[in-house]
Design a protein with these regions (language model features):
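Divalent metal-binding pocket/active-site signature
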Residues: 1-112, 124-127, 132-133, 151, ...
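Structural detector of well-ordered beta-strand residues that form the stable sheet scaffold
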Residues: 50, 95, 117, 143-145
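Short, basic, glycine/proline-bearing loop/turn elements
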Residues: 113-119
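Short secondary-structure boundary segments
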Residues: 120-122, 146-148
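Active-site-adjacent capping/gating segments
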Residues: 137-139
Length: 171
């Protein structure tokens, strides 16, 4: 079914796929199995991957590496992006949606050619860690998103998020 749907022009990526250990609604082994299969499908179809990873940082990184999400072959499918000095930077077309990992993990992902997105929680007063991570990500590998209607930024926290609030996240 999914393979057939990807033949349509509107499908531009495989995702949001990944691991969510926060609620453990699905057994972790089952999550890891299907995550691998979805990465394999994205590689087979030469499509970008959008990752959801919640409280599963190391498993996510390990599986992405093992399944070739950062391979030289995969990077060859996509145009490189230009860095701040005009140099060409390899792009694996892997996007980590609402990244909440460490600065060290962010640096590893950037070196592998991944893009990291930052959401509303970066604006929360008690979320210094995510602000520090965002400051260290080169702009060429940073995406600002809303995750609307969730993860509403300050000063609208407690209300449903809206796409128009992205400017508060970007500040």
């Amino acid at each position: 079914l999914i393979r057939g749907l990807t033949k349509k022009d509107k499908v531009q990526a495989i995702g949001e796929i990944g691991l969510d250990y926060h609620y453990d609604l699905s057994e972790r082994d089952v999550q890891r199995y299907w995550f691998r299969r979805q990465i394999q499908l994205a590689n087979e179809l030469k499509m970008p991957i959008i990752i959801h990873s919640r409280e599963a940082d190391q498993d996510t990184m390990t599986i992405l590496k093992e399944e070739g999400a950062f391979s030289d072959e995969r990077k060859s499918w996509f145009e490189p992006r230009k860095g701040p000095d005009g140099q060409l930077l390899a792009d694996s077309r892997v996007l980590l949606h609402c990244f909440s990992g460490s600065s060290e993990m962010a640096e590893q992902y950037v070196k592998l050619g991944a893009t990291l997105s930052i959401c509303g929680p970066v604006t929360f007063k008690n979320n210094r860690k995510t602000r520090q991570v965002a400051e260290r990500i080169p702009l060429e590998f940073l995406l600002v998103e809303t995750d609307s209607p969730y993860l509403t930024p300050e000063p609208f926290r407690g209300r449903p998020n809206k796409p128009s609030y992205v400017e508060y996240t970007a500040r």
